[in-house]
Each structure stands twice: as C-alpha cells, then as structure tokens.
C-alpha cells in the first residue's frame, strides 16, 4: 500500500509443465487425487511394487498414470509419444538454428557447428558416438535459452538431458522401437 505495507500475500507452488497453483488449489488437487494401483513415495517402494507385482517400472508408471488421468493406457502412451515428438522437434530446431542467443550477452549458438564437426569426423575417422548426446543436450538448452518450446523434464535447467538420451537411443540403437521409447520416458518420469 501507500505506507509500504503488503497489499496481498499468497503462496504458489510450481507443479510442473509450466503451471503454478495457489496453496488452496494444491490442497484441493491432493484431495481429488484418484487412487493408483501401484502407490509409492520412494524408489525403494516403487521397486518393491514392481517386484511384488512382477512389473517393469514403466508398466507400473503406465498403470498409475492411466488411473490418475482416468483414461486408458493406450491414451497415456499416445500422450507420452507426443512428449517424445516435442523433444525430437526441439533437438532438430536447435541443430538447425544459427546465430546469437537472445539476452544481450552475445552468446552464439554452438550446437549446429559441433554437430557439423562430428558429422565431418565421422566420414574421415572413428568418432566417439558418446559425444552426440552432449551436442543434442546443447541443442535443447540453446532452444530453451532462445525461448523455444522445450519439455521441462526433469527440470527446465536440465531439460536437455532426457531428450538427448532419447534422440541418441533412437538414432544409434538398432533395437529402438516406439514402445521402448515410451517405456524409457515412463521410467524417466518415475525417477523425476
């Protein structure tokens, strides 16, 4: 106010996906949560649920997500595939974009040039393919810095890690299937 006092006080929580809720909304969401078939609050509990029910982590997470969302497992897989597509698109944009990042610090994008160097080396000598995930992560982080569309998983600051591993898996593993991609993301979601 005019005397320098508080006008209003409110607690907000970041609940992921770029969304925030008030403390009242957060409490209401907790009350409205649907029961899940494989509840857990720690990694040890998740692993125990998987052992007890003879499930992979991705299977337990898939069943829980379907229960929470009130939809089929096929619908959850469709949504997870959509997340994978957003991650792939982010890497492709990051590898194609050139120039300076916004913000006035005159920081140039490096991912496209590093990718070009790796491609050139590949034709002339053995390349350590483990360098590719670093380039993919950098492409995502540069897209993030440029205000591009990223998936904030596990956090916005680490948004390049999961897409980089996913893209590397798809590109370099001959056994990569859509189901394995989805299982990877479901498992990564459980780990957070």
PLM regions with names:
Residues 70-192:
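Accessory "access/gating" subregions that flank catalytic or transport cores
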Residues 1-121:
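C-terminal regulatory domains involved in ligand/effector binding and gene-expression control
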């Amino acid at each position: 106010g005019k005397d320098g006092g508080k006008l209003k006080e409110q607690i907000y929580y970041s609940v992921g996906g770029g969304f925030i809720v008030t403390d009242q909304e957060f409490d209401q969401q907790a009350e409205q949560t649907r029961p899940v078939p494989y509840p857990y609050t720690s990694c040890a509990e998740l692993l125990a649920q998987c052992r007890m029910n003879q499930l992979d982590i991705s299977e337990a997470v898939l069943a829980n997500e379907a229960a929470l969302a009130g939809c089929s497992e096929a619908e959850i897989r469709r949504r997870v595939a959509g997340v994978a597509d957003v991650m792939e698109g982010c890497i492709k944009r990051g590898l194609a974009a050139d120039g300076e990042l916004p913000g006035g610090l005159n920081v140039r994008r490096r991912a496209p040039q590093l990718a070009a160097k790796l491609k050139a080396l590949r034709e002339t000598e053995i390349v350590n393919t483990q360098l590719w995930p670093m380039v993919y992560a950098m492409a995502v982080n540069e897209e993030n810095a440029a205000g591009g569309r990223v998936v904030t998983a596990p956090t916005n600051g680490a948004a390049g890690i999961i897409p980089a591993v996913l893209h590397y898996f798809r590109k370099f593993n001959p056994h990569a299937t859509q189901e394995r991609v989805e299982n990877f993301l479901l498992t990564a979601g459980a780990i957070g």
